[in-house]
Regions:
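Acidic, metal/ion-coordinating pockets
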Residues: 31-190
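Intrinsically disordered, low-complexity Ser/Thr/Pro-rich tracts
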Residues: 9, 22-33
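Bacterial N-terminal signal peptides
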Residues: 14-23
Length: 190
């Protein structure tokens, strides 16, 4: 009987050791498999810089939507899922501008997921701004729609947001659906 008690005392220790060993082996095997990666990228204050080269001066433009397009092509190839966001001031407010039509086309073609408008978009004036937001939301062969998120762009009469304040994006990461909340609160004054 004493031998049986001695055996029963050792049995849980042996089982626990076996379980820990199995967990360590499983963890080592899982470590060989790289974890899925999510990239969240943002741009801001692009000011209508569409091209790599200034069309007037011929000088190289360091930060432009063409550079973003090239960089995002490489980044999307290196991660399992990506979100691309713009924090506003995307449009050119110079003397020669088209109300943001070219910028809307660029944002859609590059594959931006959302834009949070800032001062630059509001300097367009109400009609051009609304046209810019509508152009972002168009689905066409020129690219996917871009969500406009702005919880602090309020209707003057109702004081309710003109655009959605937030969006919950769902991306596939490995075998899991991951949800990412993006809240749109942009700078409304310079």
């Amino acid at each position: 009987m004493a031998r049986m008690r001695h055996f029963l005392k050792r049995c849980p220790a042996v089982l626990l050791s076996a379980a820990l060993l199995a967990a360590a082996v499983g963890t080592a095997a899982a470590a060989d498999t790289p974890a899925p990666t999510l990239g969240i990228y943002t741009t801001g204050d692009m000011g209508g810089r569409l091209y790599r080269e200034d069309p007037v001066t011929g000088e190289a433009v360091e930060y432009s939507y063409q550079n973003v397009a090239s960089a995002m092509e490489a980044e999307r190839a290196s991660v399992d899922a990506a979100l691309l966001l713009d924090s506003g001031d995307a449009v050119d407010n110079g003397l020669v501008q088209d109300g943001g039509a070219a910028e809307a086309l660029a944002l859609r073609a590059i594959g931006y997921d959302a834009l949070v408008p800032a001062v630059g978009e509001f300097r367009l004036g109400p009609e051009a701004r609304d046209d810019f937001f509508a152009a972002l939301g168009e689905a066409s062969e020129d690219g996917a729609p871009v969500r406009v998120l702005s919880g602090n762009y309020l209707d003057e009469d109702t004081q309710s947001p003109e655009e959605d304040a937030y969006e919950v994006f769902t991306v596939e990461l490995g075998r899991r659906a991951v949800r990412i909340g993006v809240l749109g609160l942009g700078a409304m004054e310079a």
